[in-house]
Structures are given as structure tokens and as C-alpha cells.
Amino acid sequence: SSLVGSEMCIRDSYYIMPIQTPICDFGQKAHDFKLKSTEGKILSLADVKGEKGTLIMFICNHCPYVKAVTKDIVEDCKKLKDVGINSVAICANDAENYPEDSFENMIKFSKENQFSFPYLVDETQEIAKTYDAVCTPDFFGYNKDLELQYRGRVRELKKLIPVRDGDSDLLKAMMQIAETNKGPEHQIPSAGCGIKWKTN
């Protein structure tokens, strides 16, 4: 019997090692995009850029690794906005084979979790490829000059349960970027289910 997206992802997350993000390529410039948000607006990098930095997150609706840290992401992004860092989330998964990641479900997911940041759809997957995004969630933290300074995790997960022992790695790193324009030297990779690439 065929498995729906989340079941497949959960199966993958228990039996297959999650994909880890590569080491931060410090100084790499952010790439421009023009993508539709769940509110029906076409947004570019210039539209979402923050005064002190910008956080670009590749996520999706169904992945258990994303769901495990959604609460942290939402809370962290609110705190970051207060210090001049804007955030944006992008879903690039193949919605045809993973209907839980459809645009309609993106709208639902963003409302249910009270996203205070835009949630964009990358239907062609071009932007995910340009950024070399590998998994969900995959975080790209940029300084005010749009130079990459963070490519790490939100926080530690034990069996898909967040270890909440103070501020998250993501929040601490982005706060440091807001203050110094530089991310931490030591970063622990994010990990999750691979982006669901289209096969045709």
C-alpha cells in the first residue's frame, strides 16, 4: 500500500539517517527570488530583507523534523524581528507526490502555527537548487550585507523531541549576527528529511 507523505517521512526518519546540512560557507551571498506567498503576494529577497539580517528557511508542512521545531521557529522569528532580522520560509517539495505539501496545505500550516513571517512556494524548485538546500528544515542565516553566517540547527532533538534548555542555537546565532554581523564559528548542522525533488 502506498504511504502518504508524513507516514513515508516518519518511516524514513526512523529507518534512514536524516540528511545533514553542509558546513556554513561563510560570506556566500544570498540569491534573489520572486515567489508567491500563502497570502498571494509575489515577494523578492529585497521585500523580505531585514535591517540587521535575514533568515531564509527551507521547510515543508509534513516533515516530522520540521514539526518538531515549528514552535521554536515561530517564537525565535518573533524575537529576531524585534532586533531587525526578518525571516522567510520556503517550501520547495514536490506537491504532486507529497500532497500534504500543497499550496493549500501551506496556507493551513502557516495559519495553524501562527506564522509571523511569509511562507513562499518554490514550485519549480529552482530557488532550492540555487541555494543548494538539502533537507527540511534547512536554515540560511544572513547578515545585513546578505552574506551567509549561519547554516546550523534550531536546537538539539532527541528522538524528534526538542531539548529545550534555554535559547535555541538558531536564536543565539542570529542574535550574534544582529550584533556583530558575524555568525558563530562552531555550528551544529540541521538535519531532516531530504527535499522531495521532482523526478521528471
Model region roles, listed by residue range:
Residues 9, 63, 193:
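Short cysteine clusters
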Residues 183-200:
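Disulfide-stabilized, aromatic/cysteine-rich ligand-recognition loop
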Residues 16-178, 183-186:
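Chalcogenol-based redox active-site neighborhoods
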Residues 1-13:
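Single conserved hydrophobic/aromatic residue that forms the stacking wall/gate
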Residues 12-13, 67, 197:
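Extracellular/secretory pathway and lumenal proteins
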